[in-house]
């Protein structure tokens, strides 16, 4: 995960001071890309411990089309608490858009099922895309999608994915996002009988919050360790039937965790 540390250093060296929606303040750059060959290991940051339980449960929650934090709480995941209303609802965020994008005639489009069918039946298509950026429903969402748009690509029997992330909290959010989409690529590849290829991450407003600077310098002082390996213990009948117990990360030996405040 040397690329991740290089991005942190780039933001420190080249970032512009900007105000932001949260009032915290950031150092920000615009436009950055990283490529991770998933054959080389699972891209889980090793210079601090990442909470893998939260990453896995959040992705399973997205895939169920769920937008209420009750499932997350049942599994001791609190990463969405700050944005939920008194009933635990978040509005039509990621899960809703992925699984039930509304159409003008009252139907709903299941984008995940659609891209799975494309991968199986038309893998050379240039339209294998999922979008969470529904302009017509942004004002109903507790938080507008940060990781907004992703595209799959098949070549030589390998499945790759590129994500466009319009807004990226480099210290807290990005390690989660990289691991989450890498996990999704592994799951989709298994369902389509493909090998994994690359995960390409593309960031728009890529920033470090002003109250994460000490934590960033601490993390930059640490040497990355070898990447772990993801093991999927079974192949469910559907992408929607995976369970938390299906996943095992082998050889994860990170440095200690580093706490930092969330900008809301």
UniProtKB/Swiss-Prot annotation:
Gene Ontology process terms (BP): dTMP biosynthetic process; dTTP biosynthetic process; methylation
Subcellular locations according to the entry: Cytoplasm
Keywords, ordered alphabetically: Cytoplasm, Methyltransferase, Nucleotide biosynthesis, Transferase
Catalysed transformations (reactions): dUMP + (6R)-5,10-methylene-5,6,7,8-tetrahydrofolate = 7,8-dihydrofolate + dTMP
Catalytic residue list: 146
Class of this enzyme: transferase
Principal localisation: cytoplasm
Residue numbers binding dUMP: 21, 126-127, 166-169, 177, 207-209
Pathway noted in the entry: Pyrimidine metabolism; dTTP biosynthesis
Domain of life: Bacteria
Disulfide bond annotation, renumbered to this chain: none
GO MF entry, a single one: thymidylate synthase activity
Residues bound to (6R)-5,10-methylene-5,6,7,8-tetrahydrofolate: 51, 169, 263
Keyword Cell membrane attached: no
Enzyme Commission code(s) on record: 2.1.1.45
HAMAP family: Thymidy_synth_bact (MF_00008)
Name recorded for this polypeptide: Thymidylate synthase
Organism: Escherichia coli O9:H4 (strain HS)
Gene name of this polypeptide: thyA
